[in-house]
Swiss-Prot record:
One of its GO terms (cellular component) is cytoplasm. This is Acetylornithine aminotransferase. Keywords: Amino-acid biosynthesis, Aminotransferase, Arginine biosynthesis, Cytoplasm, Pyridoxal phosphate, Transferase. It comes from the Bacteria. Homodimer. It comes from Wolinella succinogenes (strain ATCC 29543 / DSM 1740 / CCUG 13145 / JCM 31913 / LMG 7466 / NCTC 11488 / FDC 602W) (Vibrio succinogenes). Its cofactor is pyridoxal 5'-phosphate. The lineage of its organism: Bacteria, Pseudomonadati, Campylobacterota, Epsilonproteobacteria, Campylobacterales. N(2)-acetyl-L-ornithine binds at residues 139, 274. Binds 1 pyridoxal phosphate per subunit.
Amino acid sequence: MGEALDKEYVLHSYGRNYVQFTQGKNATLWDSEGKDYIDFASGIAVCSVGHGNERLAGAICDQAKKLIHTSNLYYIEPQARLAEKLVKLSGYDMRVFFANSGAEANEGAIKIARKFGESHEGEVKRYKIITLESSFHGRTITALKATGQEKMHHYFGPYPDGFVYAKNLDHVFKLVDEKTCAVLLELVQGEGGIEPQDREGIKKLERFLKERGVLLMVDEVQTGIYRSGELFASQAYGIVPDVITVAKGLAGGVPIGAVMTTLKDIFAPGDHGSTFGGNFLSTRAGLEVLSILESLYQEGTLQKSIDRFSAELRALCVEFPSLFECEVGLGLMRGIRAKSAEIQKSVIDEAFKKRVLVLRSGRNTVRFLPPLTLSEREMQEGFSRLREALKGI
């Protein structure tokens, strides 16, 4: 019934698996037949505090009984408190704009870059934004154009001008010219193979751009909100970006996005806006998520989970050398590089048969994005099932 209903009335923009999940608790999901699954995907890095989190559910229910939405024409206390929390926890001297998704956050960042470029005092206006060829920044038209993967650009042109693609980090330095206003990049590419950028290279780029008055904008839609082991991967890299974009895990499943910038006065009233962005419900959820994850971080629980998960992935590479090359990633944004795209697909398919949810990334990487609240029992059960799946490949 569910599959027929979906195919009849919902646009076919997703390659769905028609399992029907009905309930979840932390990193465990149950389907309509009562079968349990270990979730190493978190709804693509969204369910940062797991499924059915009582604290998050309580905060959402409490807020929903009071106010959900009034619009940004009026003061929204949880919005201001969440902005304060993000700024103070990061240690960055920034202000925050709230949106509803990662794509919207990146659109906001691009508008900041373009206004910054337009405001440049010189004969040549700056408008070019450099991104990487294997990047992914969203599916709205401008964010899609910022995405450097040519395969993503079919059918939807003409696109906005002004985007330039670098082959790699070293190539960025060669592309910066007098018309460049910003560089937008991911420190770990979620759709590009989970390969972290070189730390010294990023620091060198930060200095290079600062000397030339070009903005460094970091897309932390997937790496942000403790997924990297720190609040932001930028902190782990020891850099201070001019702009950071956030979404996915910030509200644990409630739609939210955010743009943080050191350009605290870049927007004037009317320059940018969002009807739903920063509403009472999403920002209250964000406050609760940050409170939960901040405690895990401070206690050292998060780092212990990262270390154990990484050790399990490395062990798989040793145990199955015919399938895997190496482990990649940062924090609990991890991957194992398969020896071929065919093996990658087989691993994901066989894992699902054993009721473990994992994802793909790039040409041949199997991606792991478990809830940051993942228990040791769930981790052990998930890897036990995964080993059984791999024996059949």
